[in-house]
Structure formats: C-alpha cells, structure tokens
C-alpha cells in the first residue's frame, strides 16, 4: 500500500503502543497483511518482551518510547513518521490500579494526552497522523443501562476506569480543539491464546481448554 505525500509515494506506516499485548500483536498482523510498515513502541532496550515480538512478529520494528515521557514520544514519531497511531498501551489490571493509582493515571490517562500532544507537534497538514484510542467498558463502571452505547453515561468505579475516561475525553478534546483525526473504540472483555495468563478470565479459558484436550 502506498500513499501520496506531496507528490511522492510512501509506504503506509503505523505505530502501535501496547505491541506486546494480545490486541497489539493481532493488529500488527492485520496491518502487515494489508501492506503496512509496522512499528511497535516499547519501553527500554532490555524489555523482556522484546525478544518475543522479534520472534513472533519479525516484521515489526520496535522503537523505544515511554507514555510517561513526552520527549520520547516525539522522538518515536519523528523516526517512524506514521500515518496512523494505535494507542493500546495501558496498565490494564483493574485490581492493580487500586494499589498503583498514580502510576495507572500517569500511563493510562496522561499517556493519552502526551501521545496526542506529540502527534499535534510532529504532524500537521503536510503530515497528518490519524490516532486511535483503545477505550474500555470499565468507563461505564456502575452500569445504568444494558447494553451500553456511546451515549451511556460514564461512571467509572476504579482508578483504571477513571484513567480511561480521561483518555477518552482527551481524545475528543484534541479532535475538536486541533482538528486532529482522533477517535476511540470502546473495548469490552475479549479473550485469545495471546492474552496473559495472569488475567482471571484467561485462567478460566485456559483451564477449560486443558480439560477439553
């Protein structure tokens, strides 16, 4: 897939945060199959999951960056020059978010703001960058209606859910204030063989699979 930029043609590129998670891995495969050059944001040169990505997804080029550090995000965007950014990175353990509320807010909430600010600074009319934010059903928290829709009131009941609400509204704010192509998708619980075994639902599905086999 090529895309005309100022009269030139350039391979479409995408940058994925949360590349080591189940969604990041599957998304990378889909984009690669569509002809994209795929980059994955990873924190630290010695990240223990880097080897896994290099083995399982050899077509992904890992770049260093940290959702807690604006300058590192700017550097990552300047290096990758992506057409699209998919923000799947977060501290996604709801129970853990009560024990590490500040860290959860800093990464899962403020990390969205930093990434959008980096996109605003690096992108522009000549290099527009599209942004996708992975929002969560945890934003609904104390559910008032079933099923939930985009219009359902948000009532988070955990630091994780509150951080996701901040990221969700920040995405709207940057779209309306700066004209960025920024959107959110509200994700509900979903399982796959790539989901970490540390998640309760993954433990259940893994046990069922073992019994079946």
Predicted regions and their residues:
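N-terminal Rossmann-like NAD(P)+-binding domain of SDR-like oxidoreductases, especially those catalyzing
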Residues: 2-192
């Amino acid at each position: 897939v090529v895309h005309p930029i100022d009269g030139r043609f350039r391979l479409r590129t995408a940058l994925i945060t949360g590349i080591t998670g189940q969604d990041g891995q599957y998304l990378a495969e889909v984009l690669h199959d569509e002809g994209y050059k795929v980059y994955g944001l990873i924190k630290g040169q010695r990240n223990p999951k880097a080897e896994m990505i290099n083995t399982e997804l050899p077509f992904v080029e890992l770049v260093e960056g940290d959702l807690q550090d604006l300058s590192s995000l700017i550097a990552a965007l300047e290096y990758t020059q992506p057409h699209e950014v998919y923000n799947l990175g977060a501290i996604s353990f709801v129970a853990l978010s009560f024990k590490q509320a500040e860290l959860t807010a800093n990464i899962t909430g403020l990390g969205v703001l930093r990434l959008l600010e980096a996109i605003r600074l690096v992108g522009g009319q000549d290099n527009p960058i599209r942004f996708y934010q992975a929002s969560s059903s945890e934003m609904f928290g104390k559910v008032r209606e079933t099923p939930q829709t985009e219009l359902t009131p948000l009532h988070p009941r955990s630091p994780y859910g509150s951080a996701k609400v901040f990221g969700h509204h920040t995405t709207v704010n940057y779209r309306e204030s700066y004209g960025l192509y920024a959107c959110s998708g509200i994700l509900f619980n979903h399982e796959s063989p790539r989901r970490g075994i540390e998640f309760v639902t993954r433990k259940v599905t893994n046990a069922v699979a073992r019994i079946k086999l």
